[in-house]
Amino acid sequence: LCQAAAAADVLVVTDSRHPVQAVAGARVVELDLPARIEAELAANLPADPAQATAIVQQRLREGGEELQRRIGRAYQDVAEAWGLGIAKVPAVVVERRYVGYGEADVARAVARIEAHRRTNP
């Protein structure tokens, strides 16, 4: 990567069905992470609603602040991706302004974005 790309603010938006090769310093947002966390909390629950509620509440307590942060961050990340107008995954966003779609190799996507920026200042 060129120094500009390495120093750039890089956000990768994907999901578990579209794995990416991230680069150091890039933040990866998985759009299906909130659903996966909810599935973890709901795994193997009994049919009785009262028992299921008690078990989920226990799991939330046991997860503590770390689980709460994880859930909150997952939803914040999804909201950020929507706010950026991400239309499909994988997407690589540089400096919250330039977006490349469809490239799972983040370094290659950033290089393409940088090449575009050089030829279209």
Feature locations, PLM:
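Acidic/histidine-rich, surface-exposed loop or edge segments in extracytoplasmic proteins
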Residues: Q57-G63
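Bacterial N-terminal signal peptides
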Residues: L1-Q3
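A short, hydrophobic beta-strand/beta-hairpin element that forms part of a small beta-sheet core
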Residues: V89-G100
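C-terminal partner/receptor-binding element of secreted or periplasmic proteins
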Residues: G102-P121
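N-terminal secretory signal peptides
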Residues: A5-P49, T53
